[in-house]
């Protein structure tokens, strides 16, 4: 039975990990053992934060809508309740964009919500 040497495979595996660790500080980008741990941890953070990003953006949109609504004399919860009653189906992303960039259009939407609530 011939001897199987795995140097090529190990080199390939090491190169792959070190390539992923490129740009890391100090030993994290140079030493395989440390780099491997850093890459695994980075992957865990990336996985977690892809989910957190969705929550964070929703929170940002709600904060912007609330600020815009209060400038027009209505709280966020009352605005959303009014929009639901008026069957105006605009998602929070679009509403926040309107509140920031199109103040007149947002004010018109708030007025419609106010009219339904009154």
Curated annotation (Swiss-Prot):
Belongs to the bacterial ribosomal protein bL20 family. Keywords: Ribonucleoprotein, Ribosomal protein, RNA-binding, rRNA-binding. GO terms for biological process: ribosomal large subunit assembly; translation. The lineage of its organism: Bacteria, Pseudomonadati, Pseudomonadota, Gammaproteobacteria, Pseudomonadales. It comes from Azotobacter vinelandii (strain DJ / ATCC BAA-1303). GO terms for cellular component: ribonucleoprotein complex; ribosome. InterPro entries: Ribosomal_bL20 (IPR005813), RIBOSOMAL_L20_CS (IPR049946), Ribosomal_protein_bL20_C (IPR035566). The keyword DNA damage does not apply. It comes from the Bacteria. One of its GO terms (molecular function) is rRNA binding. This is Large ribosomal subunit protein bL20. Binds directly to 23S ribosomal RNA and is necessary for the in vitro assembly process of the 50S ribosomal subunit. It is not involved in the protein synthesizing functions of that subunit.
């Amino acid at each position: 039975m011939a001897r199987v040497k795995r140097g090529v495979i190990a080199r390939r595996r090491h190169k792959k990990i070190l390539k992923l660790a490129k740009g890391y500080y100090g030993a994290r980008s140079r030493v395989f053992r440390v780099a491997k741990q850093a890459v695994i941890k980075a992957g865990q953070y990336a996985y977690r934060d892809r989910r957190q990003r969705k929550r964070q953006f929703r929170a940002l949109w709600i904060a912007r809508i609330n600020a815009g609504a209060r400038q027009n004399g209505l709280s966020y919860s009352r605005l959303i309740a009014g929009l639901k009653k008026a069957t105006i189906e605009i998602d929070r992303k679009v509403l926040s964009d309107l509140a920031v960039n199109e103040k007149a259009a947002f004010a018109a939407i708030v007025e419609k919500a106010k009219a339904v609530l009154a």
